[in-house]
Amino acid sequence: PEYDEMRARGVTNHFSRVWIPDEPVESDEDFNKLMENIRAELDNAVKRVITCRPDYLVMGMSSETFWGGLQTSIELKKRIEDLSGLRVAMGSDACRAALACYGEIKRIAVLTPYWPVGDKNVRTFFTDCGFEVVRMKGLKCNGPVEIAYVTPTELVSAMKELDGTDID
């Protein structure tokens, strides 16, 4: 619903799911398997959605866009742009743009739904972008669907853990 709530008047959203099995994630190994499943299906999802001839492609999943750091993110974006023939926006782009709105901040805290292996890649990405990740908290969600079920109370609690005067 969030993407539909943000759409401009006259714009329609067309979705294509990256098909992955709804399997439990209980370890870094499981999280790596989830990432393999995403990679195996990402191109198919892009190919399906471009049949409606969209003007722009917004990727609503984030983990893959941070994986491997900034350079890998840039390469992924180029690959998806080449595959789709469209301009592409990704979660990693959105994070960089949002942080730029705050001026010259450098020291950040990051909250993710990921397991430690995912958090490591997010940290690498932000470090590559010139930020110092002072604190990070991964919620270790027990599966891709469970990310959507994190409660506002859980998020507020995690944000309080991350807060501090040592971050910008």
Model-derived regions: residue spans:
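Positions that flank functional sites
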Residues: 64, 96, 141
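N-terminal glycine-rich anion-binding loop in soluble enzyme alpha/beta folds
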Residues: 1-44, 111, 116-154
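Short amphipathic alpha-helical segments and helix-helix/interface helices
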Residues: 3-4, 46, 77-80, 123, ...
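Periplasmic-binding protein-like
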Residues: 55-60, 109-112, 167-168
